[in-house]
Amino acid sequence: IPALIKSINRSDILFSIYDGDIKDGSSDCTDDGYASALTMFNQLKRPVVYTPGDNEWTDCHRLNNGGYDTLERLAYLRKTMFPTAASLGRRTMPLLHQGQPGEKFVENTFFSHGGIVFATLNIPGSNNNRILDDKECSYKSARTAADCDAANAEYLERDAANISWMQQAFKSAKAQKARGLVLVFQADPGFDLPETEGLDESQAPRYSGYRNFLDGVVMQTEKFTGQVLLVHGDTHFFKVDKPLYSPTRLLPNLTRLQTFGSPLIHWVRVTVEPKNPNVFAIQPVIVRQ
């Protein structure tokens, strides 16, 4: 991490976006973990926008994460990581939030820069906190049946809020005549991989918590004349492709950027190029340890 921070600080970027996971997936979800993340973010010289990942709330129910109440951890995350309307970093920038500081949906943010609209959304891994059955509820978990019922209710409410926030981002991009829109969240929401013809991975039950949102993205992208960059983490290796169809036609104006993850501690530079019809130039930056 120190080498990563040093590399970013040496660059001439204007701001950065951190797409979730401030701890590993098998350590306790202690209060100290969030404090350490704040310290890390505030070592960055320029503004950094943070969106939550599954490691810091969705998966905290796991026994190897300390067996926490995930909804309590989500509430604590909102209060701790989003105490004001500004970004993180030594130098901050103002952000619009879907909720008030420290409250529900404050983690969903919005800002514009250089003719591009940016929106971050709380869409974490582990099927977006959607629990499919009793076996999944209790597997290596401290959860009760009541906890899982509450988690599914939380998923439904947040899924609706995320879809609304995404729709508002598209509406704003159209109103501004923006050349591009960037949507950032942590989860790999599941796409149909072209390497496995005859199998549509996106329809697997473990991705069911993302279907409503992705269907909405497809619908909005079809009606948007600019370029859409969909950025996520979770899968831990770098990838750029065009994975969405509507329903069988490739969406030419949507590009997926999957970012690096542990143990590959690198970052990705995205540049807006006015004369580039694709708008976004994507460059992986390898950090030498």
Regions inferred by a protein language model and the residue ranges of each:
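Short, flexible/disordered intra-domain loops and linkers
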Residues: 28-31, 61-69, 193-208
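His/acidic metal-ligating clusters that form di-metal
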Residues: 6-15, 119, 135-243
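Charged helix-capping and loop-helix junction motifs
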Residues: 31-37, 210-213
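Active-site environment of divalent metal-dependent phosphoester hydrolases
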Residues: 24-26, 52-61, 126-131, 189-192, ...
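Residue-level signal for helical boundary/lining positions with a hydrophobic bias
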Residues: 17, 49, 111, 230-232
